């Protein structure tokens, strides 16, 4: 029995169109990279059908004539063994000709082109990576050599139906048809290898299993034709067992639970169901790292189902890329990527918010200004931070491992919250983890650092650098190593920015040991202080000559109390930008305020003592002064303005 829906083509002249370049590129990736996970076309096409019904429901809140006397929304899947086709039909919003060309012939999703362009050759072979992106309608070409779409937009006349057909190789055709029912039917003409055998998709029981696996949570009924067992008739008195077969009926039966997963109580939902739902809404082939599902009561009532992914998406640091949660109001789908429901530093969180209090006609502009939305956003932030804290502070090894995984993927993004979410700054600070100068290979929290502070230590000391090796070998660290004082080593680009906002932790000040004067307080004895004051006097002539030689390269020159082995280091004032920060801002094309470092010199180093030598000519003194400054700049992670001049000076001094 054929399960196709007949339509009448009344325009034999086909309009041929060429796919947008990005679509052709995506189609190539889909057919060549996702063949090992061909099942996903069921998930993708059912999801699209569900979205179409959600959009109709939303539009009909203002104009219920769009239902056309058929308000029972549904998705139907029909298998035709003779024609070797599978058809996915919905009675949702449908498309007109312009919609079909735009939605099926171009990629409108923001950032898609950039995503495709950034993929390396090896990444283009990574089916998992492509699958995370979400291939939607085009996934049908994994199993089909031709796809035809018959559609009519809700509210349009029957004669304004559209047929769209493509073999996925570079072009598609569009023609006008008559279609009595609104919505869309997508028919996949299966490739030979997918129409028979164990890889085939003409087995109705297999399609049912895939729907149960990927789409059981869809709140609409997903229906297939009912099959019944029909026995052969035997003559009366004949003891021969009756043979029989499964027979397809005209009755449609619902094959999914047809209830929104988030509307059920958490205790009634299995972990596998949560995982399947996550994969369906995110296109991520990995299970989520963890999740939280709650019904929030109060001035604003809403349900939150929030997931933390296992891996960071490729566009995580593209802040203009759309991020956010799916928003429903009273189970009516409103929008994807509702970024107003999460602070920016939690943009990696996925999931669903279903509110009972927001208006159905809510727009992004209304979301921006709504007090209720702010309440939901704040509640979501607290919930995620509480979830992360439960992992971070757990004694359970599995939970500790989960937090370590989370921090490796999303730690830098969380740090943005230190400056963006002052209300939760303390919660966020408790989640931060860093390497230190004394804890080899282990990450430390501020709380753990405080517990190990020396008697008399008044501050949490930290140092920022481009990488861990640079931090461990920094000249600024030498005095602290000598005295056995632990220093937190911050090696992310966002760290210095974040520390501008986080000036203390649990009432203990944080001090960057590369900025301003180093005051060890009770950790420095009186003899050391007296020796430092004496060095300031004896070195004054050399310091003055260095100031003159360096000119406007240095803000000042001082005798250092922080150096042990190195001849010199650069120090910036409190509140000023480090060389690394200046370099990063310049690379981002931002205007950077003029900032000059102070050169600190080690009076006990042979190279500095050489500057005191009366045998040193004025020319050689100037050269050595420049070399010492440049070496300090390099040790601090900065870049030389004129590397050739530096090398020339070094070579000239070596030949003396």
From Swiss-Prot:
Q: Which family does it belong to?
A: Belongs to the heat shock protein 90 family.
Its job: Molecular chaperone. Has ATPase activity.
Molecular function terms in GO for this entry? ATP binding; ATP hydrolysis activity; ATP-dependent protein folding chaperone; unfolded protein binding
**Pfam families (UniProt xref):** HATPase_c_3 (PF13589), HSP90 (PF00183)
* Keyword DNA-binding (UniProt): no
Q: Which segments carry the region annotation B? A: 365-583
Q: What is this protein called?
A: Chaperone protein HtpG
Q: Where in the cell is it found?
A: Cytoplasm
Q: Which CDD domains match?
A: HATPase_Hsp90-like (cd16927)
Region described as C: spans on this chain: 584-656
Keywords carried by this UniProt record: ATP-binding, Chaperone, Cytoplasm, Nucleotide-binding, Stress response
Write down the species: Psychrobacter arcticus (strain DSM 17307 / VKM B-2377 / 273-4)
User: Which residues does the annotated region (A) include?
Assistant: 1-364
Q: Which GO terms describe its cellular component?
A: cytoplasm
Q: How does it assemble?
A: Homodimer.
Q: What gene is this protein translated from?
A: htpG
